[in-house]
């Protein structure tokens, strides 16, 4: 199943472009589902149809779904949530605060993304288009499987068998409720679900991310940051869509100045996102509502091309041997040396860029070797490792 995630700053037309992509894929005969994981759903508005929390048939080969995040959260987290709430309350935490603390930030959104795993397993659809939340929330969402795994492994470090033996002995001497047996089953299932979802989203052969932007400074800056952080987490960006470009016939009065501003920023888009392909769509003189209008938008963005095509392919990480030393290369566009921090763990390295930190498991050949040099060159971070293990 082909998976395409659309994200961008709020208000750039991301939902319209995602819906237009789905419409065109359906027209090409692909069984296509477009889903919205944004808490403020507008997918139904774009399609000009009522869309439910389960796949709703819109037309030939086309379905739409607005995910109910709370319901998804309950199905994946409810039993663990009950235990954690009890745990925090037992330590004197206010009941309401305990309820909030029992759900790590971003859990609602990641539960929504579990729908991708479900649809992949069911095999009903050829193409899945995901209308994600605005950029910042999407970045947190895509990083969350790593965060959730860390959170769960530290909250529940013991195995079910160990806890079954230890509980009768330990419980009388501690003030916290120890997790019951069934909790470990729920945690294990959730960890497996997170790993499965990450493997789907992180497979560049089938899943890519697309950035939608307008020709404005703040929007471009946010798109650049998104591109950087997506690269940090190994998500492949295969297309940038520049939306709502003022057409050439707009030459007079109020919009003439706006057209000049857009032209100035448009001149830099190619170099900013090179080598990612750029597609453009004009600002239409009518609202893009309903399947027919969205098909018109798809014409503008994709022309005769199949939107499910992967328009750009790249290797996010590469290991090679140079002069007897191993070098690991990571793609990190738009960052300066001062913004990057690299620390070494046991079998992994931690790369921090701005507010985002990623744990990168090292291939076996690099395990036990120390980083001797780090350099940034043409949008890539090069880490040199010692020739022999410590």
Please identify what each model-predicted range represents.
Residues 338, 367-389:
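Beta-rich strand-turn-strand
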Residues 1-12, 16-195:
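Nucleotide-state-sensitive switch-loop elements of NTP-binding domains
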Residues 39, 134-135, 336, 347, ...:
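A generic "binding-loop/recognition-motif" signal
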Residues 339-347, 364-365:
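Extended Gly/Ser/Thr-rich low-complexity repeat segments
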Residues 5-7, 34, 63-66, 129, ...:
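Structured core elements
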Residues 321, 344-345, 376:
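Generic beta-strand structural signal
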Residues 109, 113-115, 330-334, 343-346, ...:
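Charge-patterned, long linear interaction tracts outside catalytic cores
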Residues 194-337, 350, 355-357, 361, ...:
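C-terminal lobe/tail of nucleotide-utilizing enzymes
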């Amino acid at each position: 199943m082909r998976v395409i995630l659309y994200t961008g700053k709020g208000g750039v037309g991301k939902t319209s472009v995602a819906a237009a992509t789905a419409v065109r894929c359906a027209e090409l005969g692909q069984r296509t589902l477009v889903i919205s994981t944004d808490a403020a759903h507008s997918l139904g508005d774009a399609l000009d149809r009522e869309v439910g929390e389960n796949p709703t048939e819109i037309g030939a080969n086309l379905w739409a779904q607005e995910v109910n995040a709370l319901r998804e959260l309950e199905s994946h987290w409810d039993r663990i949530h009950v235990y954690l709430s009890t745990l925090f309350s037992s330590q004197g935490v206010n009941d309401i605060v305990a309820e909030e603390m029992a759900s790590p930030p971003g859990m609602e959104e990641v539960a929504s993304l579990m729908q991708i795993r479900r649809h992949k397993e069911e095999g009903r659809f050829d193409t899945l288009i995901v209308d994600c939340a605005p950029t910042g929330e999407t970045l947190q969402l895509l990083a969350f499987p790593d965060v959730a795994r860390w959170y769960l492994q530290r909250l529940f470090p013991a195995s079910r068998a160990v806890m079954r033996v230890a509980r009768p002995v330990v419980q009388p001497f501690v003030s916290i409720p120890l997790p019951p047996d069934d909790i470990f089953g729920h945690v294990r299932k959730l960890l497996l679900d997170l790993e499965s979802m990450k493997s789907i989203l992180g497979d560049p052969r089938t899943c890519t991310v697309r950035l939608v932007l307008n020709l404005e400074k703040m929007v471009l800056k946010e798109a650049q940051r998104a591109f950087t952080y997506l690269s940090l987490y190994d998500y492949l960006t295969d297309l940038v869509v520049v939306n709502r470009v003022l057409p050439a016939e707009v030459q007079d009065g109020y919009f003439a100045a706006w057209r000049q501003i857009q032209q100035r920023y448009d001149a830099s888009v190619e170099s900013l996102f090179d080598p990612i392909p750029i597609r453009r769509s004009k600002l239409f003189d009518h609202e893009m509502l309903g399947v027919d209008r969205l098909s018109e938008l798809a014409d503008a963005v994709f022309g005769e091309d199949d939107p499910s095509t992967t328009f750009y392919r790249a290797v996010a990480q590469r290991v090679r041997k140079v002069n007897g030393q191993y070098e690991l290369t990571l793609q990190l566009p738009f960052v300066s040396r001062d913004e990057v921090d690299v620390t070494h763990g046991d079998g992994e390295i931690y790369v921090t860029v701005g507010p985002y930190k990623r744990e990168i498991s090292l291939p076996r050949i690099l395990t036990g070797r120390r980083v001797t040099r780090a350099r940034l060159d043409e949008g890539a971070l090069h880490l040199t490792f010692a020739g022999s293990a410590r």
